Regions:
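Conserved pre-motif I regulatory segment
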Residues: 68-107
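Conserved interdomain hinge at the start of the Helicase C-terminal
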Residues: 124, 269-308, 315-319
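Conserved helicase ATPase core of P-loop NTP-dependent helicases/translocases
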Residues: 142, 156-166, 304, 311-358
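Conserved helix/coil segment N-terminal to the catalytic DExD/H
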Residues: 161-191, 202-207, 357
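Conserved RecA-like P-loop NTPase helicase motor core
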Residues: 179-182, 223, 331-392
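Post-DEXD/H (motif II) to motif III coupling segment of the RecA-like Helicase ATP-binding lobe
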Residues: 190-191, 198-254
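Conserved Walker A/P-loop ATP-binding site and its immediately adjacent core
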Residues: 117-119, 126-150, 308-313
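Walker A/P-loop
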Residues: 102-124
Length: 392
């Protein structure tokens, strides 16, 4: 969400202020696979165009001491919410409205399974403005399309694909497709929803984030804080006020000691060849048997197995089918699966923003209640997203 400042207002002092305060340097973690540590590349959280510059909304409000975009006449849209909010979602919406009416921004800092997508659809219907949902995963984008179709009467357009309407109320837009929308059209957008916002706090994400000048912005993510501290990008755009909830659903975590310790193969740089270590680990027969034993011993549960390897996911699924255990996999280019006792997939494919109902045409409504993490997770935010798959 941006405020457009024309060239005539760009004094030398303002330019200096922008460069000083909106140039961010990501915090680097230690990477033993590199010979030397390169200096981190800075990220400029502003976008220059021929006639001016696009600046983060909240940063502009604070530094220029006024409410950005208040003078824009946004076209109204007629949208009716046909779904139904749960009791806890109604309470969340009360807080959301207060924050939006106060600052024009809110962050839904809610655990996976809270229903951030349907809340976004409700907000769009409530405020009745041309809406853009910005995301960076095609699987997530398609879930938004389905949510709007199932819970509103809105005309929805996936940017870059064929449209059924010349005048859509809602646009679902991938980060890299924002450039397909004419500037004149983007300036009419009154509500911007940023889904899985933590994934857009990058150099490549900034042009998309600042590509719109809406009246309201809704940031949605369960894990905004990033290890490189680039969540400051989102703070400069939407501020730090949020609607937050803790996970209240009880759950157990069991650490399984496999006794497996693969030999470490050293790379040319003198450090462990991590790719080979991972492969040797999942190829270990003892470890494989332990995972399959856990699944067999919990036949009364619906199990999700997450791995970092497409090859391993397919291998485990095939092994389960040989034991007459109903199973399917979702990884690589595979776009759907059949409802089964076990689903095996990769963290990259279904670890974030995954909703079974949108990927499984035979889904019977029984959620996963057992998660087997069959790989290592480096980032805490990634772990939270993965674990969140069984809180739906």
């Amino acid at each position: 969400m941006a405020y457009f400042l024309p060239n005539k207002s760009l004094s030398k002092e303002v330019v200096q202020l922008i460069e000083q305060q909106l140039t961010f340097t990501p915090v680097q973690g230690f990477n033993p696979s590199k010979w030397t540590r390169k200096e981190a590349k800075t990220i400029k959280c502003y976008t220059k165009v021929n006639d001016g510059v696009y600046l983060p909304y909240i940063w502009s409000s604070i530094n220029f001491n006024f409410c950005p975009n208040i003078d824009i006449d946004y076209p109204m849209q007629e949208m009716i919410f046909t779904g139904e909010l749960r009791e806890n979602q109604i309470a969340i919406m009360q807080e959301v409205q207060i924050q939006l009416d106060k600052t024009g921004c809110t962050t839904l800092d809610l655990p996976p399974g809270t229903g951030k997508t349907i809340l976004g659809a409700y907000i769009a219907s409530l405020y009745g403005l041309l809406t853009v949902v910005l995301c960076n995963r095609l699987t997530v984008a398609r879930q938004w399309v389905k949510t709007f179709h199932d819970n509103t009467d809105a005309s929805v357009y996936m940017v870059g694909e064929t449209s059924d309407s010349d005048t859509p109320n809602v646009l679902i837009c991938m980060q890299e497709r924002v450039c397909k929308l004419p500037r004149e059209y983007r300036e009419q957008v009154g509500l911007l929803i940023i889904d899985e916002a933590h994934t857009l706090c990058t150099e490549s994400g900034v042009p998309a984030l600042l590509g719109f000048t809406p009246k309201y912005i809704v940031v949605e993510t369960a894990t905004l804080e990033r290890d490189d501290e680039m969540h400051c990008i989102m703070h400069s755009i939407a501020g730090t006020e949020s609607v937050s909830r803790e996970i209240i659903k009880p759950f157990k975590v069991i650490k399984v000691l496999t006794g497996v310790s693969p030999d470490r193969v050293m790379g040319k740089n003198g450090y462990t060849n991590y790719v080979q270590l991972v492969k040797d680990t999942w190829q270990n027969e003892r470890r494989q048997n332990i995972i399959m034993s856990i699944i067999k011993d919990n036949a009364n549960r619906k199990t999700l197995v997450l791995s970092s390897s497409v090859e391993y996911s397919k291998l485990l699924c095939a092994s389960l089918l040989e034991l007459d255990i109903t199973a399917d996999y979702l990884c690589g280019n595979k776009k759907s699966y059949q409802d089964s006792q076990v689903l095996v997939g990769t963290t990259g494919k279904i670890g974030t923003g995954f909703d079974p109902a949108n990927f499984c045409s035979t889904y019977k409504g029984v959620p996963f209640d057992l998660l087997i993490m069959a790989c290592s997770i480096k980032k805490n935010s990634t772990l939270q997203q993965n674990v969140g798959r069984i809180f739906r």
